[in-house]
Amino acid sequence: MPAEYFEARERALLGERYDTLYAAPQETAARGVTVSALRTTPEGFAARADFPLRPSPFCKAAFVVEQPDFKPGRHPYHHAGVFYSQEPSASSAAPLLGVRPGMRVLDLCAAPGGKSSQLAAALQGQGLLVSNEYVAARAEILKSNLERMGVSNAVVLNETPARIAAALPEFFDRVLVDAPCSGEGMFRKEPAALAQHCEALVKQCAELGADILDSAAAALAPGGELVYSTCTFAPEEDEGQVAAFLQRHPEFTLADVLGNVDYAFGSEGEANRTGGLPLDVSKVRRIWPCQGGEGHFMARLVNAGTPRTLPAPGEYTPEEQLWLAAAAEAGKKAKGGKPQKAAKPADARSARRENSRACREAVQGRSSRSRDAGAGDASPAQSLAAWREFAEEYFPELAKRPAVVHGGGVLLPAAFPQTNLHVLRAGVFVGSVQKGRFVPEHHLFTAFGALCRNCEELTLADSRTVEYLSGREIEAHTAADGWCCVTVDGWPLGGGKVSGGRVKNHYPKALRLL
């Protein structure tokens, strides 16, 4: 099964350990789900899940699904943003950053969004998450997945790492680089990756990873931390990459990769994979196929200096207040347009398959850009007034939050400075005025459904749950007339409008079950 180049290299590096470390515990690749703390606890999820689970060793919020034919994208809890479908070892990297509420966090290579959803859960709606993806189509998938997960404080970018570093130098408290890689950890999961694999691809991805790491270093604030990860085994992209980075950046130190968590997993790094450069491989981590995952490498790097003081819970720093004021001023000049529609997320398999392709495209400089559409048919003042009236009725806790007009639609903005970066979303697009009435957006319900005063409460066993997710009208049992949030077991699925005992379906067409 292994590619000829891959097997020859690994046998030379590992010797007699090769067959043991690459022995898979089962013929089919393991499936995993990671639970979002924005919705519930791992214990709360396990108590309600209707499919067999066992705890993952790689992340306290993750589980291995013990049902080979499980289709996560069709499960109502997936639609409600309760879990993200992730290969088990892929959930290991994000917790290593030690993210806390109030931090500014950058996920530099974020699509399709699994690790960003973990970082958002750690922030608990406070601070800032900037999730970037260079390939335009994947950036749209990223945006859609963060909407589904109910993330309210994210900025989604479609940019190059170098431009982000130039626009936001020394800005972030934490940076995650889950680098585009040669994807050797996908061989069992995606046999097609074998056909794409070669030594030239490894070298190209290593060069790209070095450039991305240099940009990440420039964007990291003094005292900040950076976690670098890949899903490959190639020395040039793993231990060798980190060792070379430390040679270029003496201001960084290699820290124990497990220093921010209270559990252990995997194995130490390999001393013969550093390219002859010094590296304390006991501080980095590898996950081998024999350990229950497809394969991952992780290292934690700490920048010199003193970390900034984080704001008090629920408060903005003075500069963040200025950014919000600037966004409001820019919104006064907004123009009308059509409402933005939700993107259809690709399934996790397609997103994983694109990892190596994204690396090749980035190396070759290929990427298309798509611009965010504006929304609404009212003036900025009319849009804001309509939103305030709507919020007072249905989301009173949101009525006094800072709101701005973007292209005629109303946005609850993330605190983010004005730049020339290509922003796909900066906060929560709550809706727009259409035909003289405020019409809420799907993201409003996924991000703030728990605050809605009018809810249609469904359960996993309720036949109306699948009917709603399929786009059909359902009977109203608990919601009064008007707009409502449709929930499953208390978790928000989306919006609807009640009239005459029926809930008119407003679940986005692109997301519906077929």
Where are these regions (language model features)?
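Mobile active-site "lid"/loop adjacent to the S-adenosyl-L-methionine
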Residues: A137, R174-D214, V227, C231-E239, ...
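Short beta-strand element of Class I
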Residues: Q126-V130
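Conserved SAM-binding loop of SAM-dependent methyltransferases across substrates and taxa
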Residues: P112-G125
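Helix-to-beta-strand junctions that scaffold the AdoMet/dcAdoMet cofactor pocket
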Residues: L123-Q124, L220-P222
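Conserved class I S-adenosyl-L-methionine
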Residues: G102-A111
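S-adenosyl-L-methionine
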Residues: N132-E170, V177
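Polybasic, low-complexity RNA-engagement segments
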Residues: M1-R48, A304-L514
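Class I SAM-dependent transferase core
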Residues: R54, F58-V99, L142, L493, ...
